[in-house]
């Protein structure tokens, strides 16, 4: 969770490393931005998300100016969410999150918490089963493949890979690969 401006910068830097790579110069970034690649779009989305989280956690309590900045950041982030057909709640995903293919859209992430260095592909749905409290808790280094889903009050451990088109409705231990309907 972002609690300071330094945290926000760190989160943005880690998201940039995961989505754009480590050796991206300004010229390469501008070329990718002009061409409209998926990695630049994902980086723009996460940069807007991290700035919204900072505004929500730190600036919102600091009077009218903080609330105005929060409203602007929220509007900017929701505009990008609608454009890319991605729904990720604030303060849910850790740093270093990766979206390799954002254009296909249909990504919904509504979990209690998701660890660091996770990734999701097109068509991933992570959410509650019946009530708002029944949402998954996800560890670090978890990869969701194309079309995979996770529902209910479950815990997915660290270093887990979820195969394409799998539906996870039970707890998953650390260091495992899960596939099937239901998994």
What label would you give each PLM region?
Residues 1-84:
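Terminal amphipathic alpha-helical/low-complexity segments used for targeting or macromolecular assembly
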Residues 82-183:
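Structural signal for interior beta-strand "rungs" in well-ordered beta-sheet cores
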